[in-house]
Amino acid sequence: SYRKLSRGMKSIVSNIIGICSNASITIFDEPTIGLDADNRNEFYKILLDSYIKNPRTIILSTHLINEVENLIENVVIIHKGKVIVDDSIDNISQKSFYISGDKSDLEKLKCLKNTTPDKSFGSKQVYKYYGDINEDDLKFIESLNINLETMNLQDMFVHLTKRGNKNE
């Protein structure tokens, strides 16, 4: 009986029902709980194949953000009952950065005024930043030895929920 199944097997049964329903809106709430890495990968592969054959809205809630980052088109982040991000993955990747360089250079960036460094190594600092970067800051970044790298979705999520979305 269903009640005697392990948590992972219950997840598989629920996922099969969700995928096979082909409903116009399909909701998966933590669909990989109890699944090992191989079964999680298999679920994502089957989900993507199903979506390609039958495009529809799939809502997926997960704490394993790094596993779904390449599968999603839109992201909604809810923190303390409020939506703090609702945007396409493309737009989010254009606003999520690691900014690193010499402390004296980074202090001149307007976009970092109300933030604190994520890491410091002597005179070097690394910031996590989510938001738009103005033209003056971009020109300044290009003229100095400041590194600008795209932040992954998981780090962006942690940054925004940990810091209360202060710098947006």
What spans do the regions from the language model cover?
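Residues that scaffold the ATP/ADP-binding catalytic core of kinase and kinase-like folds
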Residues: 18, 108-109, 156, 160
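Short, surface-exposed beta-strand/loop "edge" segments at domain boundaries and coil↔beta transitions
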Residues: 26-27, 31, 105-109, 133-138
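Functionally constrained cores in energy, signaling, and assembly domains
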Residues: 2, 13-18, 26-27, 50, ...
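C-terminal coupling/interaction segments
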Residues: 121-168
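ABC transporter nucleotide-binding domains
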Residues: 1-66, 70-73, 79
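ABC transporter nucleotide-binding domain
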Residues: 44-131
